[in-house]
A protein has these predicted regions:
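All-alpha prenyltransferase/terpene-synthase fold signal
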Residues: 1-122
Length: 122
């Protein structure tokens, strides 16, 4: 669940948080190698990987450069792939945990927490 939370957080940073709680692309401006960046590295041709790496590691502040990086991550499918992977992590964890827990309010809350991790917008 923790890894899924982080993947969703990284993706939200690029797609935008509800009510603009954080600036879109803050992680790029900070030069952070997030899960979507790592995912893009496995999807992009080598020349684009190098360009992405150089851009992110330079900690860009120009909104146009940050927007171009986000567009590149969208275009290569990295953000959608991250969301699918987060969903799969939560579903797999639940499949393993479900038979071990007796039906209870706590079990329902735990399941709801897993859904929240995936569906949150802030």
């Amino acid at each position: 669940i923790g890894l899924a939370f982080q993947i969703v957080d990284d993706t939200l940073n690029l797609r935008g948080f509800k009510d603009n709680l954080k600036s879109k692309g803050e992680d790029i401006a900070a030069g952070k190698v997030t899960f979507p960046i790592a995912k893009a590295m496995s999807r992009l041709p080598s020349n684009e990987r190098l360009g992405l790496w150089k851009t992110v590691s330079s900690k860009p502040t120009d909104p146009a450069v940050i927007a171009a990086v986000i567009e590149q991550l969208e275009d290569c499918g990295a953000l959608d792939a991250c969301e699918r992977q987060a969903r799969q992590l939560v579903e797999t964890a639940w499949q393993r945990l479900d038979p071990l827990l007796r039906d209870s309010r706590v079990k329902v809350i735990l399941r709801a927490f897993g859904w929240y991790v995936l569906e949150r917008s802030y």
